[in-house]
Amino acid sequence: MSRAPLDPRSPIPAPYRTGERDAIQEMARSFAMNKVLPVANRLDPEHGLIPDELRQEMGELGFFGIMAPERYGGLELGVFEYALVTEELSRAWMSVASIIARSGMALVLNPAQREKYLPLAVRGEWLGCFAMSEPGAGSDIASVRTRAAKVDGGWLLNGQKMWCTFADQADCILVVARNKPYDPDRRHSGIRQFAVHKASGTFPEGVSGNPIKKIGYHGWRTFELSFDDCFVPDDCLVGSERAETAADAGFKRAAAAMTTPRIHTAARSIGLARGALEDSIAYVQQREQFGRPIGDFQVTRFKIANMASEIEACRALMYQVAANADAGEKCDMSGAMVKYLASEMSERVTSEALQIHGGAGYTTDFPIERYWRDARLTKIFEGTSEIMQRIISDHLLPPTPLR
């Protein structure tokens, strides 16, 4: 007796499942498949930008304010719901799943600025860009050289930043810089964050940008930025100098802010892999060779089984880590684990999906190549796989002298 195949999209597990979460997941899924996917299939091959209309609709649905307090217009939900929405959007286009994180930068601003910009951010009308990496400082954040020199009324920023995605369209650039000269014996000392406010579509005085040509992550542009006596007012220093007395407080602030982005990246990785799996399941039932659908062959069926199993395992860990984060638990190690495992899985699964599609997968006629290109990036940004392994091992083993 024949039976219909099961839906590869697993429901939220019983311990975490609520009616509200089911509704949020279904809303995000419907929006992703009906609105985002057609736009992605049209614009990504030509390196087009995410349309303003799509961003506006995302704001109306609350995607930019998932974790923002209700008094600012946000939904005041948790990392768990954030991950649910991210996976669904990433299944269609990772860039759209990524842009919802840009509103969160308003949460780290000083109180007066937070009051002004957060209500706009939760509607997607004020979004940020993060400028941390430099030509000589990628994984080694403590080696940043961009300087912040104190002057009357504020600071002057000088230096270069790399991989600043959305820098042109952002309303604010959050810059990691030093307010003290670099000291190789105290590398973590003097690292601070500065909010550089600007008009969307332009760079402020003292800032210039050159777009970086990428093989993926289209939908928005990524820049190398140069800061040349860029003036930042005193109230744009994130965290008061008086409150942050520890020499490495700024570094710790930047490092501590990485847990939620790593869960976010795990969700993006899972969404990409799921898109590749779902497309592969459909393809193998249509594509025929040797007189029958290739989905009838054991080699293909086992590929599908392995892909689905890997996705499910990573999703289960993501749910656990997200729930723990919402409960206030420290998730430095588990956040690194889920980011590491999910990104590695995503590259394997999307590559296997391309193999299943054969030559067709190596064309822009199918979105598989987009999932494959974008999945490769998840092993690099928000901390490389090697840095994730370093974080995990440092939690499990005594400190190494090789620093």
Question: What do these predicted regions represent?
Answer:
Residues 60-125, 166-172, 325-329, 370-373:
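Internal helix-loop-helix
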Residues 158-207:
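A short core secondary-structure module
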Residues 146-149:
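A structural signal for short hydrophobic beta-strand segments in well-ordered beta-sheet cores
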Residues 124-132, 176:
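A short, Trp-centered hydrophobic/proline-enriched beta-strand micro-motif
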Residues 162-168, 261, 377-384:
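Glycine-rich phosphate/pyrophosphate-binding beta-alpha loops
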Residues 13-20, 24, 207-312, 378, ...:
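Glycine-rich beta->alpha junctions and the first turn(s) of the following alpha-helix
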Residues 37-46, 281, 285-292, 308-341, ...:
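C-terminal helix-coil-helix/basic helical segment that borders enzyme active sites and/or dimer interfaces
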Residues 2-13, 84-85, 101, 247, ...:
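Glycine-rich phosphate/cofactor-binding loops in nucleotide/flavin-utilizing enzymes
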